[in-house]
Structure formats: structure tokens, C-alpha cells
């Protein structure tokens, strides 16, 4: 009798393993399909959008000089070194130029790629966290078709790269903290390192602030202890430090003054556009950024308020923590709170 029972258990276990493998295969196939569709959605017609002045043209010219000069470490424009942003945006554009030539399409392809990759990652993470494929796919569809995400997935700026790496930074950190999963914490730190190579210290500072606030609200000391694994900290420095160390070794104080000083500290403490320096700036901008899903966003916030799950609280801190962080900054840009947009489609 026990032998028959053991056989049934082994058979059931084999079926479960087979189903698990098939689910992973199907999920991989689905994610590849989502990425391909999203890439076509964002890249379609990009060749009809000429590079605009002055912001897009500066990025495009810097990437072009990177290809022509062969210097892929020190960004330069008009023959002079330029420390406006880290190298990630120029690397991606330079790869695109090397493959497709110096065209408008090649200039915008990295943004389309990052937008598609962000959608794909979002779907995977939501499926992983909620165990609901329908919710995950709809989250991706809503984000892809929201106004600001669509625009920035066509724009030649660094925000699409920052979004791509901030999503896994925060969502892997959430999984790692809730499940005590060291692997996901390492992924979070690795992604944060890539975010710092995309737009500077904000790739670490903002996610770090969000996670610390959320851990505090959860009132769980174990979460704080899990937040700083030495493996994650090590992989962060291995990822982000080499380029910064190289730039300082080659360019010295001018790099520190212009990149960390002018383009980070000065913008945070002194407004470049005083006319936009209003405390309500981003709170007015957010509803327009979410179109056509604005109404659904506010409905879901109200609907889920009663339950207040750990994930819901995490998303609330993500959104409003981002808005508050940039509201306190002196310089305000339309795209600064872009990473808050991804939160709104997770609710």
C-alpha cells in the first residue's frame, strides 16, 4: 500500500516539475513576445522624428564623437570633454550608431529599447510578486500607452535608462527584503550601479531613500538588516566605481566640479528655471503624465487603501516619495519624476 502511495507521490511530483518547466518556458516565450511588440510600438516611426535642439542634439553629437574618436570612456562634444551625464546614454547611442549609422532612427532606438525592456521587466516582476499574469500584462499595457512613458520612450535623454534600471532596483529589493532572498538583493544593487552609470548618484540616493522610508513604516528590524548585504554592496561598487574612478584619475577636479558639483549639487540647491519652482509643480504634472489612465489610477488608490498590503504601501512610498524628493529640489524638470509613473501602473 505504501509502495503504491509512494509511486503516486513520485508521479504527482514529476507532473508538477513538468508543469513548472512548461510554465517557465511559456513565460519566457511570452516575455520575448512582449519585448518585441513593445520595441516595435516605440520604434515605429522614429525615423520621422528629427533630433531636436538643444538637449537631444547635445546627446547625439556627444555619442557621434564617441564613435568617431574611439574614446568610449570620456564623453566629449565639439572636441571638448563634457561631464553633463555618465556614459551609459552615450554607450547605447554609440552602439546604435555603429549598427545603423548616424540617423534619426539610430538616435532614438536606445530610448525605444529601454522602454520595451522596462515594460518586459515590469510584467515579469508583477507576475512574480502578485502571481497574476493578467494583472502583470495589463500593467505593462497601461504603462506603455501612458502619455509620459510613450514620449520618453522616443526621446533622446537619460530618463529612459534611469527608469530601466530603477524598476529592478526597487522591485528586486522588495522581493529580497520580503522573502529574505539574497540573490534579489544583489540584483537590486547591481541595477542601482547601472542606474548610477545612467544619471549619476540619484540612481542610488532615491531608491535608497524609498527603501529606508518603507522599512521604517513596516516597523520590522529584520528588513533593515536585510537591506545592506555585503555581496550587494560589493557588486554595486564593482559595477559603478570603475568608470567614476577612471574619470577622476584622467580628468581630476574638473570632473568632480562639473559633474557632481554643477550638474548635481548646484541643480539641487539653485533653480535653473525659477518660473517653474512651485511646490505643486509635480503634483499637477502627474495626472497629465498618466493619461489616459489617470482616473483608473486614483480609483485604484482609493480601492486598495482599506487593505494596505505591504506591496501597496511600498508602491505608495515609491510614488509619493519620488514626488517629495524632487519637490524639495530647487531645479524642476518635467522628466524628473518620470520613475514615479511606473509605480502608478502597478496599483
Where are these regions (language model features)?
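Terminal, Lys/Arg-rich, intrinsically disordered segments and adjacent short helical elements
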Residues: 1-23
Amino acid at each position: 500500500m505504501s509502495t503504491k502511495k509512494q509511486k503516486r507521490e513520485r508521479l504527482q511530483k514529476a507532473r508538477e516539475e513538468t508543469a513548472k518547466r512548461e510554465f517557465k518556458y511559456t513565460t519566457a516565450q511570452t516575455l520575448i513576445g512582449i519585448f518585441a511588440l513593445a520595441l516595435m510600438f516605440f520604434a515605429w516611426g522614429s525615423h520621422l522624428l528629427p533630433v531636436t535642439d538643444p538637449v537631444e542634439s547635445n546627446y547625439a553629437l556627444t555619442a557621434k564623437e564617441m564613435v568617431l574618436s574611439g574614446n568610449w570612456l570620456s564623453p566629449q562634444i565639439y572636441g571638448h570633454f563634457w561631464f553633463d551625464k555618465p556614459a551609459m546614454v552615450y554607450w547605447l547611442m554609440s552602439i546604435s550608431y555603429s549598427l545603423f549609422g548616424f540617423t534619426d532612427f539610430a538616435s532614438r532606438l536606445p530610448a525605444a529599447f529601454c522602454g520595451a525592456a522596462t515594460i518586459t521587466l515590469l510584467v515579469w516582476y508583477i507576475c512574480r510578486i502578485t502571481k497574476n499574469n493578467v494583472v502583470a500584462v495589463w500593467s505593462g499595457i497601461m504603462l506603455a500607452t501612458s502619455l509620459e512613458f510613450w514620449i520618453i520612450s522616443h526621446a533622446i535623454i537619460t530618463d529612459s535608462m534611469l527608469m530601466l534600471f530603477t524598476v529592478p532596483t526597487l522591485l528586486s529589493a522588495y522581493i529580497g527584503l520580503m522573502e529574505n532572498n539574497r540573490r534579489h538583493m544583489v540584483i537590486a544593487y547591481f541595477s542601482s550601479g547601472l542606474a548610477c552609470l545612467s544619471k549619476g548618484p540619484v540612481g542610488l540616493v532615491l531608491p535608497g531613500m524609498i527603501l529606508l522610508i518603507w522599512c521604517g513604516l513596516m516597523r520590522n528590524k529584520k528588513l533593515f538588516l536585510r537591506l545592506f548585504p555585503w555581496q550587494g554592496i560589493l557588486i554595486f561598487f564593482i559595477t559603478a566605481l570603475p568608470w567614476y574612478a577612471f574619470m577622476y584619475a584622467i580628468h581630476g577636479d574638473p570632473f568632480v566640479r562639473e559633474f557632481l558639483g554643477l550638474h548635481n549639487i548646484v541643480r539641487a540647491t539653485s533653480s535653473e528655471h525659477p518660473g517653474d519652482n512651485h511646490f505643486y509643480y509635480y503634483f499637477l504634472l502627474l495626472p497629465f503624465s498618466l493619461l489616459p489612465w489617470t482616473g483608473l489610477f486614483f480609483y485604484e488608490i482609493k480601492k486598495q487603501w482599506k487593505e494596505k498590503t505591504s506591496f501597496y504601501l511600498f508602491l505608495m512610498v515609491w510614488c509619493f516619495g519620488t514626488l517629495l524628493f524632487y519637490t524639495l529640489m530647487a531645479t524642476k524638470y518635467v522628466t524628473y519624476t518620470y520613475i514615479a509613473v511606473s509605480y502608478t501602473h502597478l496599483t
